[in-house]
Amino acid sequence: MGREFLDLFEQWAESYDQSVEGYDEQYRDVFAGYDRILSTVADKAGQVVLEFGIGTGNLTKKLLERGKTVYGIEPSAPMRKKAAEKLGERAVIMDGDFLQFPLPPEPIDTIASTYAFHHLTDAEKDEAIAKYSQLLHSGGKIVFADTAFRDKEAFRQTVEAARARGFHDLADDLEREYYTTLDVLASLFANHGFSVSFAQQNAFVWVMEAVKQTT
């Protein structure tokens, strides 16, 4: 359920914000337009948000700045510490992951996440979306930004291009984690009563907005 990558993110906690700002050349294209992407997700979110994989709290900060109530879920203790330092008392930050998490004390209208859903296998993504469908009423939404691919060939070409540039850390990451395709995601959302749209943000990342159609 993504926790197999926990050690990696506990090591990354200190330098994560530098990575998203483009200091790591291998990941510069992945995080291109990072601030704009987070703003897009924050603008699409409703008023009461359950956020998964908050990391150091960058999306959380934007949600709070827009006057939204946020319940943040993060499995990494060092990441939670960084987020708490950044956000102070403004957000509720809880230990959990995409599949196992404490329920918010009030109804939510949005589930949000950035750069994290790929930690789940496709089967786990299906399980997660099924859970979220039970939490949301009609009109509630899931707003995720994450790396995904048009099809398997696009994925293959991206990995090959990374290796050709000597970006072996990036290529290894793409092959190690569970990056999926748009058609798989569309099917998963549809199977659980969501209408979904995708908007490409850079060469890697798409914003997906899935709106609950049935109760």
From Swiss-Prot:
GO molecular function, one term: S-adenosylmethionine-dependent methyltransferase activity
Signal peptide span: none
Family statement: Belongs to the methyltransferase superfamily. YrrT family.
Organism from which the protein derives: Geobacillus thermodenitrificans (strain NG80-2)
Protein keywords: Methyltransferase, S-adenosyl-L-methionine, Transferase
UniProt GO BP: methylation
Role according to the record: Could be a S-adenosyl-L-methionine-dependent methyltransferase.
InterPro entries the record matches: Methyltransf_11, SAM-dependent_MTases_sf, Uncharacterised_MeTfrase_YrrT
Annotated positions binding S-adenosyl-L-methionine: G53, E74, D97
Protein name, UniProt field: Uncharacterized methyltransferase GTNG_2476
Cited Pfam families: Methyltransf_11
Xref: CDD domains: AdoMet_MTases
Lineage: Bacteria, Bacillati, Bacillota, Bacilli, Bacillales
Top-rank lineage group of the source organism: Bacteria
Enzyme Commission identifier(s): 2.1.1.-
SUPFAM superfamilies: S-adenosyl-L-methionine-dependent methyltransferases (SSF53335)
